[in-house]
Amino acid sequence: MQAVEIMEEIREKFKEFEKGGFRKKILITDLTPRDGQQCKLATRVRTDDLLPLCEAMDKVGFYAVEVWGGATYDVCLRYLKEDPWERLRRIKEVMPNTKLQMLFRGQNIVGYRPKSDKLVYKFVERAIKNGITVFRVFDALNDNRNIKTAVKAIKELGGEAHAEISYTRSPIHTYQKWIEYALEIAEMGADWLSFKDATGIIMPFETYAIIKGIKEATGGKLPVLLHNHDMSGTAIVNHMMAVLAGVDMLDTVLSPLAFGSSHPATESVVAMLEGTPFDTGIDMKKLDELAEIVKQIRKKYKKYETEYAGVNAKVLIHKIPGGMISNMVAQLIEANALDKIEEALEEVPNVERDLGHPPLLTPSSQIVGVQAVLNVISGERYKVITKEVRDYVEGKYGKPPGPISKELAEKILGPGKEPDFSIRAADLADPNDWDKAYEETKAILGREPTDEEVLLYALFPMQAKDFFVAREKGELHPEPVDELVETTEVKAGVVPGAAPVEFEIVYHGEKFKVKVEGVSAHQEPGKPRKYYIRVDGRLEEVQITPHVEAIPKGGPTPTAVQAEEKGIPKATQPGDATAPMPGRVVRVLVKEGDKVKEGQTVAIVEAMKMENEIHAPISGVVEKVFVKPGDNVTPDDALLRIKHIEEEVSYG
């Protein structure tokens, strides 16, 4: 539909409204406890701080409240040292009257890689048992084969399946493409269709046309909702256009955590529709009470806020979500290459095109972002290819929306070979993943595990094992929530052991907010070292020759220090295998004495939730392995050392 046609159609609708008699209550799902805090506070809000909010939200009358899934499962284990299943049970206790909703990543469940159908069924069963009613099910590639099993399981086990279409903008994503996706979802029997723009780049007239088209194509029998992040600042206008196009429900977030990388404010949307034929029936006074609770939460977790979470209209050009940008910045700081951020951002659309234009949301945003960073810092495109990109091209994530770059496909699959996406991703997953996870969890715990414990391990084995061991020892210590250091005074001759990461300085009567974002790797004594400092929001790189070293709290340096303390030497020899960026060792694939070929994969390192293959820099014999699974490493650490041997050797 053209904009002029849409405007004329809306005029006619308003004439009908003026006659009276038309009423359509718009339903509201509030996402504050999950997506709101994920967008604005890095998902770091602890369960104890969420419970008072959830208890108050139970009295408002939302259609549902999203409290679980997405990154919460991972973050609970990795940073908060909480059992995500216990979180869900505790929330359900204080919200008996409201449907609880979770974000479900299709065949990936809440992880980053496809799992077996058996694992999907097990997870859905336990989620419903522990309190979830509504499942928002999506696949990052819009390969609906990846959500079909989940939708079937949810319906069979008594849940409510909201199947999602993930919006993006590319030459292959046309109006007709969205309608085709919608018809596939209607055919699989979903209870609702969610149209999701996770990046925040859809425009109002397009919103109207697509929502109206979906409603008409599905015969008005399938309820439709809009999930629209606000990165470009147009989401609340999209909400209004969706309402006029016939949408049935809107996703919102309470105002202290709304807008920008998050969603339109619940209060704003409710007020916008109040007194109209679309009145939500929600009491604004109750929303104000909720907002006061959220304000206090935001104050406590202020350290996790970032400038990338605000409105940024540049997203309309580069299509990169705020969270993805902040991840890339963190990677480049730790790799001592922040000066390459613009190159990395420019590389993102190139990688996205090479991979067939996937929408940039989990896990495709991580796959594209990490590869773009590697392409830039290695100095050559696809010189280093992540395991995830290889798996993606081999079809292990599903079928991309468009064709894979021929050059990239041949680099991974071999000359003249093309990707085969005819096989469903789940059929390439380990069919025995549940059984293996059960046995390994039992061995770790030394007893029969619960289904929930097996699921923790099946989805996040390293993090779950760490959690189980720490829980057994009574050593579950969550990541500290440090208060912001407002001012810092350093007396002459006194240098603190750990310098503050955030402070104010006064220079000629003017105040400047300063934040140390990162520090480069250690240099030789007396040599300058790069510090990345943000002054009033502007990032600067400075070189300092320190006489006494002060380590900023929260910077990447402690990881390097940890590596040194564990006896991991710095890479100095041609045969030293290194990681392309800071990360955690997942697997070491060789042992001392093994013969290896140049380019052979010798280890796997996880960085930014993606697995990177570490290759042998030369052919020879593994002389020494310096790391083990669980070790944190930086790019200048030697993971293992290979000794070149002159005589011809045979490789097994």
Curated annotation (Swiss-Prot):
Residues 563-643 form the Biotinyl-binding domain. The keyword GTP-binding does not apply. Residues 26-288 form the Pyruvate carboxyltransferase domain. GO terms for biological process: gluconeogenesis. Its EC number is 6.4.1.7. The modification N6-biotinyllysine is found at residue 609. Substrate binds at residues 34-38, 105, 362. One of its GO terms (cellular component) is cytoplasm. It is an enzyme of class 6 (ligase). It catalyses: hydrogencarbonate + 2-oxoglutarate + ATP = (S)-oxalosuccinate + ADP + phosphate + H(+). One of its GO terms (molecular function) is ATP binding. Pfam families: Biotin_lipoyl, HMGL-like, PYC_OADA. The modification N6-carboxylysine is found at residue 196. A divalent metal cation binds at residues 35, 196, 227, 229. InterPro entries: Aldolase_TIM, Biotin_BS, Biotin_lipoyl, Carboxylase_cons_dom, PCB-like, PYR_CT, Single_hybrid_motif. Biotinylated. The keyword Protein transport does not apply. Its cofactor is Mg(2+); Mn(2+); Co(2+). Keywords: ATP-binding, Biotin, Ligase, Magnesium, Metal-binding, Nucleotide-binding. Heterohexadecamer of 8 large subunits and 8 small subunits. This is 2-oxoglutarate carboxylase large subunit. The gene is cfiA.
